[in-house]
Amino acid sequence: LRRRGELVDKIELVVASSEPASALASLADLPETVGMVDIQDDCGILQLGSGPRLEVLVSTPAQFPWALWRGTGSQKHIDHLQAFAQKLGLKLDEEGIWVNGTQVVPASEAALYELVGLPFIPPEIREGRGEIEAASEDALPHLVELSDIRGDLHCHSRWSDGVLTIEEVAQAAQAKGYEYVAICDHSQSLKIANGLSPERLRQQHQQILHIREQLGFNLLSGIEVDILGDGSLDLLDSVLAERDVVVASIHSGFRQDEQQLTNRVIKAMENPHVDIIGHPTGRLLGRRSPYSINMEQVMQRAAITGSVLEINASPDRLDLNDVHTQMARSMGVKIAINTDAHSQVELDNMQDRKSVV
């Protein structure tokens, strides 16, 4: 949970208490608890009424920072820090940190990292993918905060399959302090989502211009245009050229082979009117695996064309993932964090995805 993982099969909590037996006994009174699966001296496993099981580890108050750090993981991060500390003559094990045979109890996670000569490493990047080396070189990346987000470039309205009016989307974006928001409804081939024809798109554009002037807000006229089976786009270039923002996405033909799918996306990026590739791997968490696509090839081309790849903040997608985002960063590819919101509540999904950046 602290590492903001995409999927979890259990909830692990660390509790500080000088009376572990009493703390564990009180867990049975939690409102979502339907039964105690197992209980030991300092650990309890509970079944919840819905969702994954709950595992609770009780630590003494003094040992809480250490227990929290180990519980947060990842195991690769723990292993790498143990190896790093060993080179300094320190020992890290399940009980704590040892200096010359004497246990040292850190007062916080920050103090723990300080003992091994490192700055605090945020939980979101404790994945064992170079963060310890980066910390040792004072090169940890900046994690994006909500205050860093300036706008949302992929929102839907009632004109296609959203539930908000264009004005409601704009007002919600204003309330969040955004500088801009883009209306990117679906294009005509996605009939199930009430996709827009060129004529409807021009009508919508006029409404956007009116609301933009009325609110004095940078409301952008966009489109989420379908990438068709051969890599061509669902709308003519002359129509796309009239848009402020063009998001190109695949919504069909997922079973093509890897090179076909890769070529489709690359061909779309080579269109000068395409700004962003939406949800680039097409996954739906728990329902549909990512389609076969060579993201390294895609990013190599994106770095040349200047195309932006989306981090789609929909909880069903979270696409790009953290691995691909790190790859994009290393290759100089631009990223846009968008909500793909179809409703008021979905505009808040920005909170879930900003952490991956």
Residue ranges and their predicted role:
Residues 2-157, 163-177, 181-183, 188-218, ...:
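Charged catalytic cores and adjacent phosphate/nucleic-acid-binding surfaces used
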